[in-house]
Curated annotation (Swiss-Prot):
GO terms for biological process: G protein-coupled receptor signaling pathway. The gene is GNG14. G proteins are composed of 3 units; alpha, beta and gamma. It comes from Homo sapiens. GO terms for cellular component: heterotrimeric G-protein complex. SMART domains: G_gamma, GGL. Transmembrane segments: none annotated. Keywords: Cell membrane, Membrane, Transducer. GO terms for molecular function: G-protein beta-subunit binding. Pfam families: G-gamma. This is Guanine nucleotide-binding protein G(I)/G(S)/G(O) subunit gamma-14. Guanine nucleotide-binding proteins (G proteins) are involved as a modulator or transducer in various transmembrane signaling systems. The beta and gamma chains are required for the GTPase activity, for replacement of GDP by GTP, and for G protein-effector interaction.
Length: 107
């Protein structure tokens, strides 16, 4: 019986992995690598650009970004999603399942 449970678990994990990979296949990704910059911070370089000078350098939180479009897209996504983030806007007390319920007295 335990082998049957293990097989079902393996199938479930495989199905989850396939679903995850299918989702990731549809995402347009930009490859970046981290290198040391002269200023002591980290520098993100687009893999296809090499190490030459880039006119479109953008400073983001002490990082020199060689992919300003990618950084702008990420910043846009974060600001759009911020209104739905429970860590930023909080959870309404009526829907918070972790909030302690008010005690009541049994008569």
């Amino acid at each position: 019986m335990s082998s049957k449970v293990a097989i079902n678990s393996d199938i479930g994990q495989a199905l989850w992995a396939v679903e995850q990979l299918q989702m990731e296949a549809g995402i347009d990704q930009v490859k970046v690598r981290v290198g040391a910059s002269a200023g002591g911070g980290k520098r993100w370089e687009h893999m296809g650009q090499g190490t030459g000078a880039c006119l479109g350098l953008v400073w983001l939180n002490q990082l020199v970004c060689r992919c300003p479009k990618m950084a702008a897209d990420l910043l846009k996504f974060c600001t759009e999603q911020a209104k739905n983030d429970p860590f930023l806007v909080g959870i309404p007390a009526a829907t918070n399942s972790f909030k302690e319920k008010k005690p009541y007295a049994i008569l």
